[in-house]
């Protein structure tokens, strides 16, 4: 990873997004070095007919505002993580959650690819750099990064990586990949004449 100037701590905001039950809260919880702040609520009848939990039948809670965590990538870089709620009825909060973010991780469950289209569209329309993180659930058929890229029709420069949202090291690598991508994009923009 590109080194930040030593002696100066840099912090950055990262948004973790994706569909309902894709692993956003799990990712924030697995990598955060502080006890994550979550806004999990018991699922109620308000979600009946709205939230499709057939692929996550054991899910009994859901994020209703955001998840928050923090990780020090090294002594010079601290990332603040903001997980979005996955249900469409909470998307009105996304504009506030992305203010000041340098980039986003879009979590993908390959059993429900369509659930991440809205997040991809959201970040593309706001020109916020993002990467795709394929959450490899137990028993989930693995699809190559290229297969997922093709299915989502995303640009070739957008990183697509596999991860296990339950693994601290795996999710840390996702975050490092996003920061490196953002830094590369910024350098390219700075080198391009206006």
PLM ranges: what are they?
Residues 2-56, 70-74, 78-80:
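Conserved G1/Walker A P-loop phosphate-binding module
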Residues 138-194:
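Canonical P-loop GTPase G-domain recognition
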Residues 52-88, 95-98:
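Conserved nucleotide-sensing/catalytic segment adjacent to the nucleotide-binding pocket
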Residues 107-157:
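Conserved C-terminal guanine-recognition region of P-loop GTPase G domains, centered on the G4
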Residues 81-84, 104-109, 132-136, 162-164:
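Conserved beta-strand segments of the P-loop GTPase G domain that flank and frequently precede/overlap
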Residues 1-2, 193:
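Acidic, low-complexity intrinsically disordered regions
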Residues 87-111, 121-126:
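Inter-motif core of Ras-like GTPase G domains
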